[in-house]
Regions:
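Multi-pass alpha-helical transmembrane bundle typical of ion/small-solute transporters
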Residues: 1-234
Length: 234
């Protein structure tokens, strides 16, 4: 199905939502795939990296992949269901739909290149900025700056508190390891859900605002297969 999209350049989607649902263009597909790659290959490692590293020896990569995929699919389809086909969780409400052009699709490509070179960039700011107006762009920039500031302060305060309470040199008791592992999986799952529900807009911006069910299946497959490659490579 994916090959058919690429060869034809566009595909008619059964919908009554207007022009944005009439066709998924080649540039929409390219932008979606590049944005999905950026999220899976780069951004998701920041969220799941510690969890993966601490569980690699105990669990097969297929088990970790299945767990991460389950949360991803639950987040994706829950958002699609409760928001009337909108997988961005309403984050694109202030960015009107527009037909995707080559320069829109170039944004996630530049993002991938920059992250591969080790340059710290904001995925949301770089990808969504090419679609947003100046007013929306200014609000995005302010929210990003405030978000980074709050995250930095909160992380530092929590780190100080944790280091005061826990002694790294003291090993965890055997009877407590299971509880700590369960807590790690639960908190990582919640963090993964929170991050996905926020950053899904970076991918959804290349798709119709109301995604039909057949396209949702394709989107789900792209994510799950992409995660499989990421976990297999470690």
């Amino acid at each position: 199905a994916l090959l058919c999209f690429v060869v034809s350049g566009s595909v008619k989607l059964p919908s009554k939502k207007g022009k944005q649902m009439d066709a998924l263009t080649l540039w929409s597909l390219v932008g979606f795939l590049l944005a999905a790659y950026a999220v899976i290959a780069n951004d998701s490692v920041q969220t799941l990296g510690t969890w993966m590293a601490s569980n690699n020896e105990r669990f097969n990569y297929k088990t970790l992949w299945a767990a991460a995929s389950a949360v991803l699919l639950a987040t994706l389809w829950y958002g699609w269901t409760v928001n009337g086909g909108d997988i961005s969780y309403g984050r694109l409400n202030k960015i009107p739909w527009q037909e995707v052009q080559w320069y829109h699709a170039a944004a996630p490509l530049i993002l991938v290149a920059l992250t591969r070179m080790g340059v710290p960039v904001s995925t949301s700011f770089l990808v969504l900025s090419v679609f947003a107006s100046t007013f929306v762009l200014e609000k995005m920039l302010m929210k990003s700056m405030m978000g980074y500031a709050v995250a930095a302060v909160a992380a530092y305060v929590i780190w100080i508190g944790v280091t005061k309470l826990l002694n790294e040199a003291k090993p965890v008791k055997e009877e407590h390891k299971k509880a700590w592992r369960i807590a790690q999986w639960v908190t990582t799952g919640f963090l993964w859900f929170t991050w996905l529900s926020h950053d899904m807009a970076n991918i959804a911006v290349f798709l119709p605002r109301q995604v039909p069910w057949d396209l949702m299946i394709l989107v789900s497959l792209v994510f799950v297969v992409g995660l499989a490659f990421m976990f297999k490579e470690g």
